[in-house]
């Protein structure tokens, strides 16, 4: 199962309110193996992160009401660049199998 274009556009539209530089879709929706029980995994890359937990909560609030379950990670560009080379890190999985759905 893949993410519908209309839902992807709505996700991007809502998350633009937190000024992302890039948004990745990863996990089962990116690989085409999603089932009806799958959540939608997103990584939001943004320059200024005041509080990671607050940013993740804010992103989830923005996505509320779309009728899907979301798991949202937030990272700076520097964190993503550093950890995407680390074996076993979620950032490496994202760099290898994820899809960019928004970039400035």
Region spans (language model):
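Short hydrophobic/aromatic beta-strand micro-patches
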Residues: 43-45
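Acidic Asp/Glu-based divalent-cation binding sites
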Residues: 39-41
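Catalytic core of pol beta-like nucleotidyltransferases
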Residues: 1-22, 30-36, 47-104
């Amino acid at each position: 199962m893949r993410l519908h274009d209309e839902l992807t556009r709505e996700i991007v539209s809502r998350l633009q309110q937190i000024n992302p530089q890039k948004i990745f879709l990863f996990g089962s929706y990116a690989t085409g193996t999603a089932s009806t029980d799958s959540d939608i995994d997103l990584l939001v890359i943004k320059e200024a992160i005041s509080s990671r937990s607050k940013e993740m909560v804010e992103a989830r609030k923005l996505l509320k009401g779309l009728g899907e379950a979301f798991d949202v990670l937030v990272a700076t560009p520097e964190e993503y660049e550093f950890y995407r080379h680390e074996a076993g890190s979620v950032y490496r999985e994202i760099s290898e199998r994820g899809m960019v759905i928004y970039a400035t």
